[in-house]
Amino acid sequence: MPDHRRLRRRLEEIDARGYTEKNGVLLRWGKEDWAIDWTEIFGPGVRSWQVDRDDFDQVLLTNAAKQGATVIEGAEVKRVLFDGDRAVGAEWTEPRTGERQTGTFDFVVDASGRAGLIPARHFKHRRSNDTFKNVAIWGYWDGGELLPSSPQGGINVIGAPDGWYWVIPLRDNRFSVGFVCHQTRFLERRKGHESLEAMLAALVEESPTVRDLMASGTYQPGVRVEQDFSYVSDSFCGPGYFAAGDSACFLDPLLSTGVHLAFYSGLLASASILAIINGDVTEEQAAGFYETLYRNAFERLFTLVAAVYQQQAGKANYFALADRLVGESESGTGYERVDGAKAFAQLIAGLADVGDAMAGRNVPPQMPRSDEGNSVGQLFVAAEQARRMAEAGVPKAPVSEALNRSTAWSCSTRRPACT
């Protein structure tokens, strides 16, 4: 999330928390090792952090209170209240007494995450995506190493025949090590182990790379499992409300886009509400701004992630696709294309999305066409096929399998679309 650092200048305490500084990512993907280093591409002043989410969330909450927000901790929001089709308030339980309370608001920002109070519970228009129906299993080690060419503090992403591993350096020399695969494959693997601990240990042993990286570390008991099922809502906003972050959509953990999309949608929602209150735009105009920019960010990343899951395509094709997804970037002399590596970095760092929002651009990126007859066009077809299969609810198979069937499709759309 390097793009958000300048937007959070008042959160100096983030630096004080001692999080590992993250300067990029190294992927051992297919037959290649390749790294994206923020400092080499964007300069030495751009970086991000490998945060402990519980601690990081508390930092953000504390800062919100310092800025004047009224914070009620321990409350459970039961539902959002509507007057017709307009969100007007919320109902929650009082944390000390358990009594139900209600409040009315000019605008409601649904940041309820996967609970999705408005899209999933109220409107019931959030649709799951079988293509990215993945499950993650992970644990923590004291001590360990990263691959030699890794950017400082960068995540290592290591491909496997039926999934992929992450190795993340955290503060105090702790490492998060996880494996992600499709739910079907996860359940098949689970049958062969008496416990989740045994399964994780076997997975680490199965990968020579991960095994060597963790050889000097000590496993800390406690395995976590999370369903990383992708989904998207039919609408991201409406009269009186904005659905932000995971409430509106969730992609996949492959390129670590979750925190960026949460911050980005929060930025868009805040700007939209402020512009409405100030009388700069109508509520309808603000909703169009939010819906277009947030959905385009999600769909663009969806296309890139679906393509990267085709592990044998190679970084040159990923970079070329990223260049087409970013399209034209604004410069002092007009518009110019960026090189593929920079475009890829801009996408996974979130800079492309923030640049679009700040420049007021909501034009979809230029997309390759299947009739171009080159590898980039075919890679887009593969990603587009995964999208169509997800939209249709088929197949119940890993995205890599769906991508391998890409020749069955012909696509001439100029933008990704998940609705």
Model-inferred region functions:
Residues 17-18, 187, 191-272, 277-301, ...:
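FAD/FMN-dependent oxidoreductases across multiple families
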Residues 1-30:
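N-terminal FAD cofactor-binding segment of flavoenzymes
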Residues 56-59:
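Short active-site alpha-helical segment characteristic of glycosyltransferases
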Residues 120, 159-162, 168-233, 237-239, ...:
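Mobile, glycine/GP-rich and aromatic-enriched active-site lid/loop segments adjacent to catalytic centers
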Residues 21-23, 30-31, 81-88, 237-239:
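A short, glycine/Asx- and small/polar-enriched loop/turn
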Residues 274-419:
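C-terminal helical "tail/cap" subdomain of flavin- and related membrane-associated enzymes
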Residues 62-214:
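Predominantly flavin-linked oxidoreductase catalytic cores and closely associated redox partners
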Residues 33-51, 89, 180-186:
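Helix-loop-beta segment of a Rossmann-like dinucleotide-binding subdomain
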